Amino acid sequence: MAHKKAGGSSKNGRDSNAQRRGVKRFGGQSVLAGNILVRQLGTKVHPGNNVGLGKDYTLFAKCDGVVTYEKFTRKRRVLTRVHVLPAEQ
């Protein structure tokens, strides 16, 4: 004989881990080659000088330097581009 009533079953109770997207290095910050600048879905921020684009749209520094962001217009849309200004040797 059962001593407990049957517990209900639920199809909820799961959650995925956060993706941790966003800007990792802001304008004016110093970076080393290979540092991640922005993690994003699609190109919210476009790569500029000395910035590479990974297969998951991650932007990374190609050389040591200082990060700068700029707004620019393309086909009547205002877009953001990130550059790395090389450090003076």
Swiss-Prot record:
It comes from the Bacteria. InterPro entries: Ribosomal_bL27. The lineage of its organism: Bacteria, Pseudomonadati, Thermodesulfobacteriota, Desulfovibrionia, Desulfovibrionales. Residues 1-26 are annotated as: Disordered. PANTHER family: LARGE RIBOSOMAL SUBUNIT PROTEIN BL27M (PTHR15893:SF0), RIBOSOMAL PROTEIN L27 (PTHR15893). The gene is rpmA. This is Large ribosomal subunit protein bL27. GO terms for molecular function: structural constituent of ribosome. GO terms for biological process: translation. SUPFAM superfamilies: Ribosomal L27 protein-like. Keywords: Ribonucleoprotein, Ribosomal protein. It comes from Oleidesulfovibrio alaskensis (strain ATCC BAA-1058 / DSM 17464 / G20).
